Curated annotation (Swiss-Prot):
It holds the Pfam family CxxCxxCC. It comes from Sinorhizobium medicae (strain WSM419) (Ensifer medicae). This is UPF0260 protein Smed_0627. Belongs to the UPF0260 family. PANTHER family: UPF0260 PROTEIN YCGN. The lineage of its organism: Bacteria, Pseudomonadati, Pseudomonadota, Alphaproteobacteria, Hyphomicrobiales. InterPro entries: Puta_zinc/iron-chelating_dom, UCP006173.
Length: 155
């Protein structure tokens, strides 16, 4: 019987830098532009991606320096994970902070970074870059798929 995975044994605060980074499944959902209703505080997702998000790999093109280019980019910390209401329901950070397990398609479980895409979780092929969209047109790009959990593995 194997050793229990680190995300089941450690709190977010106890994780090493490498363990913390590996909780990211590479879906790209957190890098989508979101709209917030000022009255209700409800969050609406768009299919508009951050200027730095690669639409195919679903990874940041300049991760280490992203906040220099995108000053409002959110740096996730254990505290931020617990406070940010818009993290997708499939987010590894959110799941672990809530004491839940990772989904089968998470690369830490599957051993394959492509399963997040095969399961239909990632933004791959479903987004447009924010540089191409006028902010007044963002409502034309509202989507609900970031709130879906994805497909089960094929038998």
């Amino acid at each position: 019987m194997g050793e229990m995975p680190f995300w089941k044994m450690k709190s977010l605060e106890e994780m090493s830098g490498a363990e913390w980074e590996s909780l990211c499944d590479g879906c790209g959902l957190c890098c989508l532009n979101k709209l917030e209703d000022w009255d209700s505080s409800e969050i609406a997702w768009t299919s508009i991606r951050c200027t730095l998000l690669d639409g195919e790999s679903c990874r940041c093109r300049d991760y280490d320096n992203r906040q220099a280019t995108v000053p409002d980019c959110i740096q996730l910390t254990p505290e931020a994970v617990r406070e940010i209401s818009w993290l997708p329901p499939t987010c590894g950070y959110r799941l672990v902070s809530e004491g839940r397990d990772l989904y089968w398609w998470h690369p830490l479980v599957s051993g394959d970074p492509e399963t997040v895409h095969a399961a239909g979780i990632s933004v791959r092929g479903r987004t447009v870059p924010e540089d191409d969209i006028d902010i007044e047109d963002y409502e034309d790009y509202l989507v609900t798929w970031p709130l879906e959990v994805g497909r089960e593995p094929a038998e």
